[in-house]
Structures are given as structure tokens and as C-alpha cells.
């Protein structure tokens, strides 16, 4: 009888111990916002920059944008994109801390906006949350969106590649597009999510063909802009950010697909969700916009009320 009791006790103890070990592995492998300050690799090399800039820099990204403090700048020109209609070839990769979408064929060039230089798109990244009330890196009046598409481009007039430009003045232009929760599917965003679903584990890649940027960048005329940094190590402060005023729609089903992505090579390694960096101190930087909210035109007031609604009441 005693042996039977001892056997049951031992078996139960081992089951509990196994659960605790699995929980510990999950905790240690999880790489969401709470452990963002660990050295996330940037091209596998931090030797040309200072990792400490992520903590000591005074022009870091992302930031919280207060709409009442926006500065209207009539000199900001419209951003133009050459190649919106092109059928792109992309490589979608699970980097562990992010989904990276790299252009492999056609060149897409950005002109205008806050810069007089031409910039070539190099790659895109997607930020998203474990719940639909969070996910974006930039926030508006303290409110987050369910996700954020970030498009990174480098200055082709001054530099040869993204890596070189990321350490140089006027090196990088980053375009941010917020996700807004809805029922309508954006066909090209759906294509990206479907490709990401083929890269569940870190290091997996998938080739995606036929994507057009014009459905991801539906409106580029209205934007906000500020000087900031790469939101990942080495956090170089060489980035001009453009935050588009109009979000694109993502469905809850698509978000659930993204949340299934893993940060390592096993199912229990934790979800990639909450891969956003916390907002950084603005340190007296100004955020300019080409939207004149002081205009008496009624459409401007409607735009402000609609476009800047984040997750106040489950968008």
C-alpha cells in the first residue's frame, strides 16, 4: 500500500515538475517588449555602432505623438513613390524578434515629403500585439493600434546600401503605416500574412511574388514627420520618420495568424507578439505635419477625429 502511494506521489511530482520546466523555458525564450533591451541582432553585427545608444540616445524612436503639439509646416511636399504598381518579389523571413520582408528584384524609390533626397526601399517589418489593444510602436495621444507596418529605405544619392546609410546623416527614411482592426481584407496585406504563416519558426523564409505596394500605401498625401532612430539595435539616430495619417485594415483572423509565429525553433519558444519597442522620451523634438488642422474646412476636422482614433474603443 505504501509503495502504491509512493508511486502515485512520485508520478504526480514528476508531472508537476515537467509543467514547471516547460513554463520556465517559455519564460526564458519569450522576446516581447519586456525583454526588448536585450541585444536584438542587426545584420548580425553591432561593431560599427554603440549598443548603449539605445539607452543614452536623445533622439530615439518610437515616440508618442500628441496631436495638440503637432506643428503645421506648409513647406512639406507630397511624398511620391515610384513603382507603386510594380509586381514585387520579396523574401519573408522570421527573424525571431520580427517578420522582415526584403525586396529582391525591383527598386522602389521614395521622393519628396520632408527630404530632398531619393530613398530606395530596402525592407519592411511588422509590429503586432498579443491583444488588439496594442501592437504598434508609435502611439497617438497615448493610444496604440493593433499593429504597424514599417518600411525602411536608404539614401541612394549619398550611400551605397542600407547598412552604410544607417550610420550616416540623412541616411534612412522610415515610413510607418498603422493597422486598424476591421472586417475587410487588404489583399496584399493578406498575402504578406499568408507568407508569414509559412515561416512559423525563427530562420525560416518564404518567397512571395506579385505584391503591389499601392494597396499597403493607400494614401501618402497626409503625414507627420520627426527625426528619430532605428527602433532596434544599434538604434542609430539617422532616421527621418514619416507617419502616414491613414491606417490600413487588418482582420482579427490575420492578427491571430501572426500571433502563431515563434521567436525560436520550437512551438514552446513563445509568440513573436508584442515585438514593439516602448515609446521613448521625445526630448523637445518637434513633430511636423502637412495637415492644416486650423483650417476652417470641415473635412480637416473630420480627418483629425477619424484618422487619429486608435484603440479607444476597439477600432
Q: Which residues are covered by each model-predicted region?
A:
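Alpha-carbonic anhydrase
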Residues: 2-13, 17-315
Amino acid at each position: 500500500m505504501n509503495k502504491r502511494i509512493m508511486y502515485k506521489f512520485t508520478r504526480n511530482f514528476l508531472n508537476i515538475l515537467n509543467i514547471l520546466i516547460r513554463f520556465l523555458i517559455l519564460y526564458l525564450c519569450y522576446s516581447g517588449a519586456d525583454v526588448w533591451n536585450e541585444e536584438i541582432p542587426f545584420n548580425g553585427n553591432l561593431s560599427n555602432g554603440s549598443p548603449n545608444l539605445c539607452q543614452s540616445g536623445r533622439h530615439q524612436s518610437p515616440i508618442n505623438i500628441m496631436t495638440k503639439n503637432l506643428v503645421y509646416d506648409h513647406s512639406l511636399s507630397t511624398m511620391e513613390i515610384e513603382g507603386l504598381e510594380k509586381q514585387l518579389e520579396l523574401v519573408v523571413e522570421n527573424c525571431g524578434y520580427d517578420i522582415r520582408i526584403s525586396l529582391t528584384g525591383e527598386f522602389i524609390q521614395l521622393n519628396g515629403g520632408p527630404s530632398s533626397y531619393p530613398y530606395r526601399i530596402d525592407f519592411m517589418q511588422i509590429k503586432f500585439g498579443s491583444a488588439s489593444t496594442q501592437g504598434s510602436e508609435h502611439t497617438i495621444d497615448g493610444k496604440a493600434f493593433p499593429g504597424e507596418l514599417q518600411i525602411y529605405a536608404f539614401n541612394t544619392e549619398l550611400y551605397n546600401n542600407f547598412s552604410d546609410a544607417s550610420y550616416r546623416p540623412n541616411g534612412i527614411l522610415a515610413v510607418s503605416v498603422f493597422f486598424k482592426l476591421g472586417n475587410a481584407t487588404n489583399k496584399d496585406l493578406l498575402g504578406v500574412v499568408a507568407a508569414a504563416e509559412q515561416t512559423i519558426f525563427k530562420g525560416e523564409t518564404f518567397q512571395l511574388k506579385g505584391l503591389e505596394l499601392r494597396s499597403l500605401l493607400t494614401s501618402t498625401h497626409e503625414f507627420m514627420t520627426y527625426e528619430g532612430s532605428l527602433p532596434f539595435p544599434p538604434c542609430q539616430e539617422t532616421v527621418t520618420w514619416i507617419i502616414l495619417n491613414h491606417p490600413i485594415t487588418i482582420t482579427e483572423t490575420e492578427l491571430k495568424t501572426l500571433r502563431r509565429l515563434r521567436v525560436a525553433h520550437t512551438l514552446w519558444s513563445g509568440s513573436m507578439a508584442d515585438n514593439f519597442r516602448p515609446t521613448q522620451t521625445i526630448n523637445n523634438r518637434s513633430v511636423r505635419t502637412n495637415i492644416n488642422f486650423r483650417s476652417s474646412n470641415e473635412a480637416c476636422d473630420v480627418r483629425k477625429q477619424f484618422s487619429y482614433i486608435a484603440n479607444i474603443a476597439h477600432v
